[in-house]
Amino acid sequence: IAENLKLGFLVKQPEEPWFQTEWKFADKAGKDLGFEVIKIAVPDGEKTLNAIDSLAASGAKGFVICTPDPKLGSAIAAKARGYDMKVIAVDDQFVNAKGKPMDTVPLVMMAATKIGERQGQELYKEMQKRGWDVKETAVMAITADELDTARRRTTGSMDALKAAGFPEKQIYKVPTKSNDIPGAFDAANSMLVQHPEVKHWLVVGMNDNTVLGGVRATEGQGFKAPDVIGIGINGVDAVSELSK
């Protein structure tokens, strides 16, 4: 009897609905096509390399991974080669020691730039709908440029705002230490104190949580809801936040 094909699916943040959805449909594909999916959480480098060892021990022939750190790419690819396992990167592209994308590893990701552009276009539309004076308005762009997909989204958003006619000199970028609400909140606070002249804020971020962190920071600095527009990317965390 042919033994059942096993494939791993490793994700960096299993608690995030995005990755839960990926796992759910991987399981569905496994049922439909007749293979077993071994799901493992890999929040850091050590757990990632250990997970590849345990996949090999269980007889898996390959794995899909959203790595906790793109710079682990060379180590992941080398380990996979050592076990003669196939590897596909999902969402975040591997980079080599020099920080250059590893094109040798197949990548499946969404159109991050296009999604970012849509965020920027909708922010501009909503600003016009509210009749804000552009001179009193600024963009707070909470960035995580070391993560390729995040950089594509926020750059796409800022490019779309500029293309619509928003002045580049009023787009302020601030890096976040982490892509969650506390990280974005701290980043946004550090920016808000530098620009007391701004009366209206457009908040750009790579996901719902970075945008929520930015919005909460404006709230803490006394801005009211009519003077802040934030558009998240994901449609998950913002939904639960707004239902409170």
Task: Give short role names for the model-derived ranges.
Residues 1-244:
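A residue-level marker of the well-folded mature domains of exported/periplasmic proteins
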